[in-house]
């Protein structure tokens, strides 16, 4: 039911083109995944989202458990039917949100107890419970429950988080029973190379359908992100999709692809769009700026999104300045289209074996400067 096939390699880097088959369709990799935390990418319908070229969307177990609850989603026929999305879905376990957002009362080897931010009640979440919730939600891919240490953290604290993550992965694997849902493990280890190597080896030993690299983009220097990805990716199974969590800038995506990463997700494109910022030609454009007031050209002549095909910079400026919701939707659609087109262009370059030349300006040793 799940299959990952590699169709092309770059002859100069570890970049590859693949196809990840799921019960709800295929995901062509490398591929950026929009984030629909609460079963929606904010301000965008499922039909509009499909028009951006999105093939797989991420939703969040923590937030959906709090509201509306996995029972309601299951009664609706699962997350796909609940949100009207018939393509692949992935649910994050909620571990990152719990350790970064929630008011933690207790964390131990059994699990975590935290305060519900909506009503103040106590909630206990264990690896088993996290998997039960994700099985009820019914996404194509469920993520193992892990402990994501903050940055900075001491080596001893990161090592303890790794041991807990590995023990929890075993419990997640034992609990997960669905054949129509793939379980992905998560590599942790902070910025410590030996802990990353150890975690990669342990997670790979579970022989799961896919593996993610977690605990990056949590405040560490970008150079550490590059180093971690370059170190960990070659340690993961060649025949499984590799997912780099929380990465959504062009440079970071290009660098990660060169290291052999296949999947990415990030709230950046939609968050920027909701704040009036468009991603154009490697730059961030603030559409509130007066320079767009009388500019009747599209944001990007080559872009296929609704905003660029039907509207001008002046109109988008007008919408954003007047806080019209349509402006936020149009910019979110544009930004998502830009990210997805970028990964599609990378894919074509790998197939043509010109990735290392065409995307050299995005690599860390390039003098070219890109703001996103």
UniProtKB/Swiss-Prot annotation:
Pfam families: TGT. Substrate binds at residues 92-96, 146, 188, 215. Zn(2+) binds at residues 303, 305, 308, 334. This is Queuine tRNA-ribosyltransferase. Its EC number is 2.4.2.29. GO terms for molecular function: metal ion binding; tRNA-guanosine(34) queuine transglycosylase activity. It comes from the Bacteria. Belongs to the queuine tRNA-ribosyltransferase family. One of its GO terms (cellular component) is cytosol. GO terms for biological process: queuosine biosynthetic process; tRNA wobble guanine modification; tRNA-guanine transglycosylation. Homodimer. Within each dimer, one monomer is responsible for RNA recognition and catalysis, while the other monomer binds to the replacement base PreQ1. The active site is at 92 (proton acceptor), 265 (nucleophile). Gene3D superfamilies: Queuine tRNA-ribosyltransferase-like (3.20.20.105). Keywords: Glycosyltransferase, Metal-binding, Queuosine biosynthesis, Transferase, tRNA processing, Zinc. It comes from Prochlorococcus marinus (strain MIT 9303). Residues 246-252, 270-274 are annotated as: RNA binding. Catalyzes the base-exchange of a guanine (G) residue with the queuine precursor 7-aminomethyl-7-deazaguanine (PreQ1) at position 34 (anticodon wobble position) in tRNAs with GU(N) anticodons (tRNA-Asp, -Asn, -His and -Tyr). Catalysis occurs through a double-displacement mechanism. The nucleophile active site attacks the C1' of nucleotide 34 to detach the guanine base from the RNA, forming a covalent enzyme-RNA intermediate. The proton acceptor active site deprotonates the incoming PreQ1, allowing a nucleophilic attack on the C1' of the ribose to form the product. It catalyses: 7-aminomethyl-7-carbaguanine + guanosine(34) in tRNA = 7-aminomethyl-7-carbaguanosine(34) in tRNA + guanine. Binds 1 zinc ion per subunit. Pathway: tRNA modification; tRNA-queuosine biosynthesis. InterPro entries: ArchSynthase1/Queuine_TRR, TGT, TGT-like_sf, tRNA_ribo_trans-like. Its cofactor is Zn(2+).
